[in-house]
């Protein structure tokens, strides 16, 4: 498909799952994923409250890629503090990543990509960025779980 070929949300997120399985190291390919309402996909490695998310903000024309902390207030604060302490390491691999408190006591470590519409070009960019986020952040998240 050409770069400008428009994709329905279902096609886009199905394609993103397939691309991630192809791009991720073998040890990170066995994620659980679910579509959220609208233009949203979440994936995780056994803790759904700490999940990676791809979310198309249609009004802003942006696609958010990131790691969301949506557990208890205590868990979210622990995760926020842990990743704040690792931001130099994170920024070395994900230079546009931002860590911020968010809605309902949640927080997120994310960036946005231009996405006026969902097409093959956005899918390619999203797959690269999301694979980078997972490969960079999941080992850190695994360390957080051990502490």
Please place each PLM-identified region on the residue numbering.
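Polar low-complexity intrinsically disordered regions
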Residues: 1-3, 146-147
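Polyanion-binding interface signature
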Residues: 2-106
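Charged, low-complexity intrinsically disordered regions
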Residues: 90-147
